[in-house]
């Protein structure tokens, strides 16, 4: 852990620098796999699944029998927990629905906007040591609410050719229309181009390692949208003497266990709290099953002391954290003043884990400073805003002259003529 006291603002950028890795060698691998999947479809997918996941898959699509077996193997306790989380996520995302917006901008000119679902959605769900079935809820629930009629899910199989049962259970519960045993670069490529088994989709969502991240970025060159740029998980906590050191330490560790490249930062106006949190981290770290991973992240963590809350807020907005926890006497000051954060957690009893699982907000959030210009996943992520206009004769008369003048000024005479013909027809019809 690195303690930093009263850093000058011109040092903030270097102090808050995210862990970065070169992707040049990764890009070459990603392009090679994309090219092969585009040409050979399922054959290429099977090849790379065997190479990277160590298993030969006869049938890529998960069968109904496999889903039924998974459902039976998930404990009642976990099913109940997933049900509660799904209920809260559903409530919060249904509330995000917007009504049709309609305006008569001038007499005879009616304009309106409607949200329409993206028809084909692809979800990528990592497996491995932390199978993120919670991400299925975060992505499939709003996709279903939005009305997406094809929800495709890809997740890597284990050595026995099986996807984690909790992932299958959540996918079935949340209306996923097709589940496929494919992970990594080949999964993103398959959803980008489409194969014999994997449908081509219009937008891809979901987390992943560096290979998946670069693959998603490459997919955009082939007309596929993605949820957002992705990077290692991160958390910034602002806390004062009203915070509970054990709680603060537990939240920092909850992010640190995601990966060695996760970034966790504490900003405080209290040196006493910083020391107490540092001590608590060491105590809690020793009992974590994933402590080897968490220790690497914690070694690069920052414990930053600043003189006052105004400086703290400026630093936080400069950083733009994925997750931002406020444990301060002046929580309104921070919650009203923060402009750059993916999701905000307020108070001693609002752990970041709540947003990860069951409070109802979405845990798919911008990292790597993208909270300055990207939103986290929400209902609108699965829709497009379409605009409509309907103009009467009176309406074209009211705006026609302005259109003619503007079109002529831009040298677009066919644009002008499209209006002139209509105005003349109205005039001649009188």
Label for each model-derived stretch:
Residues 1-7, 178-183, 303-308:
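Short acidic-hydrophobic, aromatic-tinged amphipathic segments that line or gate anion-handling sites
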Residues 1-119:
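N-terminal Rossmann-like NAD(P)+-binding subdomain of aldehyde/semialdehyde dehydrogenases
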Residues 98-103, 225, 262-267, 287-297, ...:
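Flexible, glycine/charged-enriched surface loops at secondary-structure junctions
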Residues 103-169:
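Conserved small-residue-rich beta-alpha loop and adjacent elements
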Residues 173-263:
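Conserved NAD(P)+-binding/catalytic subdomain of aldehyde/semialdehyde dehydrogenases
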Residues 258, 266-337, 341:
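A glycine- and small/hydrophobic-rich beta-loop-beta segment
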Residues 317-430:
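C-terminal core of ALDH-fold dehydrogenases
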């Amino acid at each position: 852990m690195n303690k930093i006291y009263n850093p000058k603002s011109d040092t903030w950028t270097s102090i808050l620098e995210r862990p970065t890795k070169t992707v040049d060698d990764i890009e070459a691998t990603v392009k090679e796999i994309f090219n092969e999947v585009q040409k050979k479809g399922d054959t290429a997918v099977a090849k790379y699944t065997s190479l990277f996941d160590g298993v030969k898959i006869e049938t890529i699509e998960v069968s109904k029998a496999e889903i039924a077996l998974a459902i039976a193997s998930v404990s009642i306790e976990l099913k109940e927990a997933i049900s509660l989380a799904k209920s809260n996520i559903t409530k919060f995302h249904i509330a995000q629905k917007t009504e049709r917006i309609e305006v008569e901008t001038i007499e005879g000119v009616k304009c309106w906007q409607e949200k329409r679902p993206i028809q084909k959605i692809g979800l990528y769900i990592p497996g491995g040591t932390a199978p993120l079935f919670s991400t299925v809820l975060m992505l499939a629930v709003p996709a279903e609410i939005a009305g997406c009629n094809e929800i495709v899910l890809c997740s890597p199989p284990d050595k026995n050719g099986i996807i984690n049962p909790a992932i299958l259970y959540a996918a079935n519960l949340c209306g996923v229309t097709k589940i496929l045993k494919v992970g990594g670069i080949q999964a993103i490529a398959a959803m980008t181009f489409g194969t014999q088994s994997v449908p081509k989709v219009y937008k891809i969502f979901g987390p992943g390692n560096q290979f998946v991240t670069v693959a998603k970025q490459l997919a955009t060159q082939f007309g596929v949208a993605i949820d957002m740029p992705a990077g290692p998980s991160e958390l910034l906590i602002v806390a004062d003497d009203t915070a509970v050191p054990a709680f603060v330490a537990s939240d920092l560790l909850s992010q640190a266990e995601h990966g060695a490249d996760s970034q966790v930062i504490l900003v405080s106006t209290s040196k006493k709290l910083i020391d107490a949190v540092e001590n608590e981290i060491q105590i809690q770290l020793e009992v974590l099953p994933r402590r080897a991973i968490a220790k690497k992240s914690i070694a690069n963590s920052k414990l930053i002391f600043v003189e006052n809350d105004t400086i703290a807020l400026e630093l936080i907005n400069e950083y733009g954290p994925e997750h931002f926890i406020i444990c301060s006497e002046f929580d309104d000051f921070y919650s009203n003043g923060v402009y750059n954060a993916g999701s905000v957690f307020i108070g001693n009893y609002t752990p970041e884990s709540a947003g990860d699982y069951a409070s109802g907000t979405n845990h798919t959030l911008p990292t790597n400073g993208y909270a300055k210009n990207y939103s986290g996943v929400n209902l609108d992520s699965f829709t497009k805003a379409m605009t409509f206009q309907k103009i009467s004769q009176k309406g074209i008369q009211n705006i026609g002259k302005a259109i003619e003048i503007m079109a002529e000024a831009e040298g677009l005479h066919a644009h002008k003529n499209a209006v002139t013909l209509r105005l003349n027809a109205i005039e001649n019809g009188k």
